[in-house]
Amino acid sequence: MIAKAKFAGADAVKFQSYRTDQLVHPEDIADFCRKSELSEDDHRILMAECEEQDIEFMSSAFDLESFYMLCELDVQTIKIPSGQLFNHVLLRAAAESGRTIYLSTGMSDWSDVVTSVELMRAHGMDMDKFVLMQCTSAYPCPPEAVNLRVLDTYSKVFKCRVGYSDHAESPAAAILSVAFGVSVIEHHFILGSVGLEKYDIAETPDEPVSLPPFPFKVMVDRIRQAEKSLGSGIKFVHEAEEPMLHRRDVQL
């Protein structure tokens, strides 16, 4: 999967780090989570493969123990998922870690975001290493719930980098987010339906919003085109226009 993500143009691959017993209580959910829980040795194997493929390894920390494990493994970029936006102990540890931190903001309102960001700032978060991620925690997320314009608000109010965590069925929002100045776009990735048969699809909510390698690569290519299309903001005659200059109308 890591090699395929590299082929598809991803700059990094992100996993999920959690301890099931600290994260969930209903036993039916816990059984599902244990199927995907990664041990410390699993993390080391994945990190080695990422190094081999020359792609950045990062992970989402769902609890304090997992966050400290990632720090001990010298993971430099750690995401705090939306469900932990209210975990002030974890946010404080993240702010004090010196790591690059992505903070996702699904299932929150404006006051929640302000409280969390200001708490991290108060505990020494280097805002040059901080990315505030717009996210709508719906699988799939309907277009009217994406709310890309909040990215402008985030960057203006908090003076930080912004990113977009995409759960939409179409890659349109991910591509459009470039126009709002994102430095990070996160999108779920799968190899295909092969291997999902051991799970109940009802238990894998991200499958409908995940892209396999070739569609993912198309999305990345279009994102790169969108980045080039933004331009400088200064109006000038581009060299691409020069062959047409002699055709300009002249009126007296």
Residue positions per predicted region:
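Catalytic cores and adjacent flexible loops of soluble metabolic enzymes
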Residues: 1-252
